[in-house]
Amino acid sequence: MPIVAMTVNGQSVSAEVEGRTLLVQFLREFLHLTGTHVGCDTSQCGCCTVHVDGVGVKSCSLLALACDGATVTTIEGLAVDGKLHPMQEAFHEYHGLQCGFCTPGMIMSAVDMVNRSGNDLDAQTIRAQLAGNLCRCTGYHNIVKAIQAGAAAMQGAEMPVTAGSSGIGEPVRRKEDLRLITGKGCFSDDVNLPRQVYAVMVRSPHGHARILAIDIQHALASPGVLAVLTARDMLADGLRPIPHHPFALHPADIRMVNTDGTPVFAAPHYPLAPDKARYVGEAVAMVIADTVAAAKDGAELVGVDYAALPAVTNTIAAAQPDAPRVWDEASSNVCLDADVGDRDATAAAFARAAHIVKFETWVQRVTGVPMEPRAAVGAYDAATGQYTLYAGSSGAVRLKDDLATMLNVPAATVRVVMHDVGGHFGTRGMIYPEFALVAWAARRVGRPVKWTCERIEAFVSDYQGRDLAVEAELALDADGNFLAMRGSNIGNAGAHTGNFSPLQKGVEIMSSIYRVPAAHFRARAVVSNTTPTRPYRSAGRPEVIFVMERLIDLAARQCGFDRVELRRRNLLTEAELPYTNPFGMIYDSGAYHEVMEKALVLGDWADFAERRAEARQRGKCRGIGVANYVDTATGVPRERAEVTVHPEGRVDVIIGTVSTGQGHETSFAQLVTEWLGVPIENVRIRTGDTDFVKVGGGTHSGRGMRLASIVIWNSSQQIIAKGTRLAALLLRCEPSEIRFRDGRFAMTGGDRSVGLFDVAAGAMQLTDLPDDLRGPLAACSDETVNVASFPYGSHVCEVEIDPELGSVEVVRYAAVDDVGRAVNPLIIDGQVHGGIAQGVGQALLEQCFYDSATGQLLSGSFMDYSMPRADNFPFFATQLSEVPSPTHPLGMRPAGEGGTTPALGVVINAVVDALADYGVKHVEMPATPERVWRAVIANAKRFG
């Protein structure tokens, strides 16, 4: 093999490489510089950006041999003598990252941008030049701010450093940033074990086909191939199907059952398809080899004999009695057919209505696309029978339990470890087939097995989201009061009956935060020959809020009401709360009117007419929209925190959530700083390893901070109570004479005190202590919270459309979101920005396109799936409302999903408003230039 030599981060390196070795592979696999990430394999995402001879390049599209003799700088080499580069400092100071997976590429691209274009960069220039870099978390708002500040600092400007306290309510800069901005994070593909081998999946090219035979002989003879495993091996070894949990597990969520009393259809989802492939990308075999290249070569030689069958992909088509059946065991593709609400009361209300507004829509299928592709390493210890899985997910404990079920072994023999996780959004919320496969394969071959998903593979194998067909009606009286709503929702579960919770959690808030006395909906779930769907950010709520907000705008237009006044008339007032909506959900509290009024001011609704007139003079159409929302935050109700105060000056918190970009290492530490009075740098949050995390529901459904705050508070109070008794012994007084404040136990009326860490030392050193005071100063709180939380808010969006091109530009976006009590406003704002971007992305850009005849995914790469980029957005105007929730002991509401929930509705409301002069009543999502242009042309012809 040829030898390549180059200088990397100031060091001369050389190695023998295959001719097909890419620069990114050389950096990661030969030099172990894992800060350079691979996010797409097609040079579309920018995660792999490095500098070659001082110029930014995408290392996934450059051969290592092409860099022979070159000077290469990676993110690990950007800091000099331990001092952060100004651009790294700026990303930290301006919260320019969340999960951190795209961040090294962003920073390297930003430095290159400054080197090419100078230090005086405006936002428009930055957004345009950053179009080659993707971020799924941030919405780019803070990234652009960071690059502006970093560019100035590279020219010598002083970087502002935020100072102040580190307790609740402070915009503390994130602790985890320092490893992520320097390339020292540890994502799943960064994990490598001694003697590991590599897995590649053989996936079905058919949307629906019977598997007749699999020939593995040629693959087994391929150099480097160690094993080829099929469903026959899987079944012989006793592997079980994925233990799906189809419905939301929280007691507060509504229950859905088939109206005819039959069981809800549930199909076995094996990690390798044993009889039929039911969607393009379903794994049918696995090749294990010494190298990834050898495994890929072997996979090409696996011969699978298929008998193609008719496929069905469309949601409504799948519900028809004569549709091709995805599962032979079922009588139809409808696996759930439920009724919710009051049919009779709703019918009576419609009978007396002065106005009835109808709306039919399909909320298209999208995919979460975390920037980190999935990866997993499985290991097996034959001596102990212990399995270990290294993989990113939303929670280690749930993954461990599900993995043990699939492997058919006791949970005690399974360990799950996860480090940094590059985005979640619901896509990582459940176990995947490959996680069980690598653990099983490790036992079969006697060596650790690693699998890394390529992006094109992720598009067909990652769980997808949304895909809801809706028919809805809204009844109003002559004055515009809402009387009732009714309709039908059909959710597309994909090929497997994995999860109906988006359908369930959506329909339960179909009426949103409006006064709707009666409602009735039919809720159905169907299977189809498409990738399985799961909850995607805000699971089911963006779809139904979209429907409700479109109904209101349609009603205003059809019946002659003002859009804002119609909302004011029907929004619930604070005096009406708590309020039971027509589906049985109890909204605890909220200043719904106040939040909408704030959003209208923030979005400058009052002066919109002037901006519209100015746009018309330029031949453009300008529109504005408003949307109100409520979320139901439930999720797994149980969480536990174990808090230990160490005498050497550290507080450890063990908890079952996992940060996938939310900043738990910082915001959870702020809680401890507030309540125990210790410096934030002395608090360590420990998660993601089932060797020490024994209980926890993970991070989903807005449960992270909501439940963590409760159990950390309880544990902190226990520590203070225990510490008070210990301090009394140390100070030789009564516990009633002790007061705890700012990390110290002090005697009242005197100057004697002892610090928290000294008390912890005393607990370990004192003799003759009561039994309950002996040992470490520690406490544990294990709570099950059976009440839901209802974050809410109001968003205003303004768009400008070129009617000749159909192009839509979001020119303003304002959001007011109520979070009850904000722990870290900086982090929350970042969460809102990212949520908005994902919602706007669905409204204008994103869709999983399937060929209806074959089930082929036609949008299977970043070249085909239109992801939001930096130049798709303006800066966002965001504001937090803090009305304490009475159902949370600290008044908190979740904040991670609210940005997405109203975004679909507010954007399309603005688009339709912009096209009002053309008589356009609705534009389906995504409102692409072609779709908007066709709406303009069709209505221009109609109206002459």
Task: Name what the model sees in each region.
Residues M1-V161:
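Signature of N-terminal electron-transfer/Fe-S-associated modules in redox systems
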Residues A66, L78-A79, M234, S393-A396, ...:
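Acidic, glycine-rich active-site loops and adjacent beta-strand->loop/helix elements
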Residues H95, E170, E176-R179, H250-A267, ...:
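Glycine-rich loop/linker segments at domain edges
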Residues A151-S331, I356, R444:
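Flexible, low-hydrophobicity surface segments
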Residues R179, E300-T313, S394-A396, D401, ...:
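Extended active-site and interfacial segments that coordinate phosphate-rich ligands
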Residues A231-R232, P251-I254, T262-P263, N408-T413, ...:
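C-terminal catalytic domains of large/alpha subunits in multi-subunit enzymes
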Residues T346-L407, I624-R650, I655, Q662:
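Conserved beta-alpha junction segments in alpha/beta enzyme cores
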Residues H424-G446, K450-T452, H664-V672:
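Thiamine diphosphate
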